[in-house]
Amino acid sequence: MTIKLIVGLANPGAEYAATRHNAGAWFVDLLAERLRAPLREEAKFFGYTSRVTLGGEDVRLLVPTTFMNLSGKAVAAMASFFRINPDEILVAHDELDLPPGVAKFKLAGAHGGHNGLKDIISKLGNNPNFHRLRIGIGHPGDKNKVVGFVLGKPPVSEQKLIDEAIDEAARCTEMWFTDGLTKATNRLHAFKAQ
């Protein structure tokens, strides 16, 4: 099994660029930068895309330009065009249930209330069997404050932790292609930014 599509979830536009909900896009942006493969807008895929080589494999990067709750439209368009199966997709997203400074790989599972994941599962024919990169952003402590929290900007101290976790996640994603998922997962799951 090889990953052929890496997606970073986000809301479009400058007003959302620095919000916690865009952590997935921060990850794909960093990966594109590390691999010297600038993202370019591609209307037919409803997002910014790039093509990279990881461990000798041809991989597409995607940051949808749809709103978060419509992310599945972009993912399904690209998966359909390139004949990519759900289990060949890695979706990076913000994760309330992990603290800033932590990121974890996961295969399949429910959407956990995340509107981006919810729409992707739906648009892939109710198939949740894709890989996720869960980027910890922490939780406001009150479920009624979640919307404002994910659409807010993290304080500098938290941003630093999130950035360090994303940096490690990018390294571990590259490692996945050269050394396998188990080794990459073990390394990433042992990491906690200080």
UniProtKB/Swiss-Prot annotation:
It catalyses: an N-acyl-L-alpha-aminoacyl-tRNA + H2O = an N-acyl-L-amino acid + a tRNA + H(+). It comes from the Bacteria. It holds the Pfam family Pept_tRNA_hydro. Keywords: Cytoplasm, Hydrolase, RNA-binding, tRNA-binding. The active site is at H21 (proton acceptor). InterPro entries: Pept_tRNA_hydro (IPR001328), Pept_tRNA_hydro_CS (IPR018171), Pept_tRNA_hydro_sf (IPR036416). GO terms for biological process: protein quality control for misfolded or incompletely synthesized proteins; rescue of stalled ribosome. One of its GO terms (cellular component) is cytoplasm. The record marks D94 as: Stabilizes the basic form of H active site to accept a proton. Its main location: cytoplasm. The keyword Hydrolase applies. The record marks N11 as: Discriminates between blocked and unblocked aminoacyl-tRNA. TRNA binds at Y16, F67, N69, N115. One of its GO terms (molecular function) is peptidyl-tRNA hydrolase activity. Belongs to the PTH family. This is Peptidyl-tRNA hydrolase. It comes from Shigella boydii serotype 4 (strain Sb227). The gene is pth.
